[in-house]
């Protein structure tokens, strides 16, 4: 995608995603980027594909860890936008249950993302909600040098931690963290990843939702509804530190 946006000032792009994560997330929306030494996706553009071809049959070939990687993003959609979809996922018997209704799952996820992107292509408002779990998730990825945990594993743990922070701030219902933790564990994803406060600080400093001393933190008002809350970065770090202490 980044190459298509860059070569000759842009050439047509067709996406043919072959993992669950790319089918429900990165192939839809037009964000194209490459990683830099300083962090993920720091050089990029918005470049919409002319066509996205999704074949759910290719998912049968994925190792369980790669399938689970995509399930983190699937679960995210239920958390931020569709309580009924979250309940539907909760009733699935792991990977087998999801694959039994995979076409509906793909349509639901892609539809939700497309609806957001149509209204906020450039990620200045509503689209920020799609980053639920990602600020902390990027901290986990970078802290472990992008080797120990996959993107989906990091996002899963980030969603769980963000839900706990939301409860502390009085924004998120008390039962939400446990429900998300149960869901991610069902699909073989971690609900916690050890991380230092300095790693969190580095990730928050690089987060594109930040402006000056503030950052928009994506929290849940309830399961199925997210909100972007402006916070001082140091205040967010203080909340993270408290949650980390409570989990020792």
Residue ranges and their predicted role:
Residues 15, 53, 131, 218-221:
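Short beta-strand segments
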């Amino acid at each position: 995608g980044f190459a298509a946006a860059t070569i000759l000032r842009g050439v047509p792009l067709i996406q043919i995603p072959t993992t669950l994560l790319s089918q429900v997330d990165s192939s839809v929306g037009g964000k194209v980027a490459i990683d830099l030494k300083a962090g993920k996706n720091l050089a990029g553009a918005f470049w919409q594909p002319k066509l996205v071809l999704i074949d759910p049959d290719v998912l049968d070939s994925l190792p369980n860890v790669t399938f689970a990687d995509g399930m983190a993003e699937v679960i995210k959609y239920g958390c931020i936008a569709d309580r009924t979809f979250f309940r539907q996922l909760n009733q699935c018997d792991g990977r087998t249950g999801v694959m039994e209704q995979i076409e509906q799952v793909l349509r639901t996820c892609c539809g939700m993302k497309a609806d957001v992107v149509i209204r906020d292509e450039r990620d200045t408002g509503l689209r920020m909600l799609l980053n639920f779990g990602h600020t902390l998730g990027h901290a986990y990825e970078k802290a472990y040098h992008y080797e120990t945990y996959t993107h989906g594993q990091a996002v899963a743990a980030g969603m769980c931690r963000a839900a706990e922070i939301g409860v502390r701030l009085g924004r998120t219902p008390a039962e939400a963290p446990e429900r998300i933790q149960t869901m991610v564990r069902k699909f073989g994803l971690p609900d916690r990843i050890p991380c230092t406060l300095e790693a969190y600080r580095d990730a928050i400093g690089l987060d594109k939702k930040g402006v000056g001393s503030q950052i928009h933190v994506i929290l849940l008002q309830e399961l199925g509804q997210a909100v972007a809350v402006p916070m001082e970065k140091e205040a967010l770090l203080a909340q993270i530190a408290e949650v980390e202490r409570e989990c020792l």
